[in-house]
């Protein structure tokens, strides 16, 4: 599966690209200021359905270039995997509010509770993850299922019908001990929904 990776001008982006390439995926990187129509044309030219990957980034979804337009055009057409800002942008695209978290974290290892879901197979009931965020998604609609959380903050959301999966934490962080396995299972899970 080819991955179209949206870089939200974040220092973690190429750590994620490296992890995905180590897993054997072909990754094409585009920044969030790319013309959304051009990106959709590129994705539609692929012989097999590609995956759209949304990186972490500074700020909020509204200040992230063409990110929300890209999501609006890709949603329901391509599987989408979002990390941190990626979760917030996907949640906002479904009507959730993005608010300031009661705790600002930058490089904090946190044990989060995992719900029983295929994407977490073999990873246990909780997982230590690396968190870097000051914002969170709130007021999620019913069509976004929260499959992991910490202190009432959604840490993982999914919409299987629309092939959407997102994490508030950073799988590529050294603090996320099973991060590579989770990335592999995440891409595999979305690929299996095609």
Swiss-Prot record:
Cross-referenced InterPro entries: Anth_synth/Amidotransfase (IPR050472), Class_I_gatase-like (IPR029062), GATASE (IPR017926), TrpG/PapA_dom (IPR006221)
Protein's UniProt keywords contain Amino-acid biosynthesis: yes
Subunit structure, as described in the record: Heterotetramer consisting of two non-identical subunits: a beta subunit (TrpG) and a large alpha subunit (TrpE).
Organism: Helicobacter pylori (strain ATCC 700392 / 26695)
Keywords: Amino-acid biosynthesis, Aromatic amino acid biosynthesis, Glutamine amidotransferase, Lyase, Tryptophan biosynthesis
E.C. number: 4.1.3.27
Pfam hit, one: GATase
Superkingdom per UniProt: Bacteria
Residues annotated for L-glutamine binding in this entry: 57-59, 88, 134-135
Catalytic activity: chorismate + L-glutamine = anthranilate + pyruvate + L-glutamate + H(+)
Associated pathway: Amino-acid biosynthesis; L-tryptophan biosynthesis; L-tryptophan from chorismate: step 1/5
Catalytic residue positions: 84 (nucleophile), 170 (for gatase activity), 172 (for gatase activity)
Name of the featured protein: Anthranilate synthase component 2
GO BP: any one term: L-tryptophan biosynthetic process
SUPFAM superfamilies (UniProt xref): Class I glutamine amidotransferase-like
Its job: Part of a heterotetrameric complex that catalyzes the two-step biosynthesis of anthranilate, an intermediate in the biosynthesis of L-tryptophan. In the first step, the glutamine-binding beta subunit (TrpG) of anthranilate synthase (AS) provides the glutamine amidotransferase activity which generates ammonia as a substrate that, along with chorismate, is used in the second step, catalyzed by the large alpha subunit of AS (TrpE) to produce anthranilate. In the absence of TrpG, TrpE can synthesize anthranilate directly from chorismate and high concentrations of ammonia.
GO MF: anthranilate synthase activity
Keyword presence, Secreted: no
């Amino acid at each position: 599966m080819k991955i179209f990776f949206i870089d939200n001008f974040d220092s973690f982006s190429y750590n994620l690209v490296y992890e995905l390439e180590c897993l054997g995926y072909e990754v094409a990187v585009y920044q969030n200021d790319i013309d959304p129509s051009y990106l959709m044309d590129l994705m539609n030219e692929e012989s097999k359905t590609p995956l759209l990957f949304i990186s972490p980034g500074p700020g909020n979804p509204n200040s992230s270039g063409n990110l929300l337009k890209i999501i609006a055009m890709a949603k329901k057409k391509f599987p989408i995997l979002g990390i941190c800002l990626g979760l917030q942008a996907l949640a906002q695209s479904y009507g959730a509010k993005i608010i300031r978290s009661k705790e600002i974290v930058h490089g904090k290892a946190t044990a989060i509770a995992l719900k029983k879901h295929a994407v977490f197979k073999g990873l246990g009931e909780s997982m230590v993850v690396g968190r870097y965020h000051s914002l969170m998604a709130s007021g999620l609609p019913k069509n976004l299922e929260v499959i992991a959380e910490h202190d009432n903050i959604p840490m993982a959301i999914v919409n299987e019908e629309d092939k959407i999966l997102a994490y508030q934490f950073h799988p590529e962080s050294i603090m996320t001990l099973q991060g590579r396995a989770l990335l592999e299972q995440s891409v595999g899970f979305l690929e299996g929904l095609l």
